[in-house]
Amino acid sequence: MQPTIKSYNGWPASKDQAEIGVKSFKVKGTHLKLRCAEKVAPLLCGFASEFHHLIEPLDVGSLDDWGFAFRDVRNVPGKLSNHASGTAIDLNSSRHKLGQVGTFAKGEVPMLKALAKKYGLTWGGDWTRPDEMHFEVSIGPAKVAELITKLGLEKSE
């Protein structure tokens, strides 16, 4: 049975991770695993791998990189975060704290935005309340499948 609740971006959400296909997926080239929805894992993990190699290394052992979390959007009761559907990740959160601006070097921001766009993601650093650690799927299931094929991404493990 499909969950009837949805996260902010319209993807199915549930407290039961198995119900929406949330699992731990390895980020290629790192020791990190992210908990995210299987349907979007190639995009989120592919992005995280390129982020690690091109923007900054993902911290190993600092526990500041994550995906799935069943919760509301901060300060917006009743609106489920995209973390609740396994379609959002936070990377290096101890370096890029919620509300802080300019946590990335100016030269990194254009590449960061281009990478996010390449993978069909929105970057929280562009929001009115900046969340520079945050990246979320901004396209629907059909476009996700199409983009995974176009980018030649393998099914995440």
Predicted segments — roles?
Residues P42-T87:
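Active-site-adjacent loop/helix surface patches within enzyme catalytic domains
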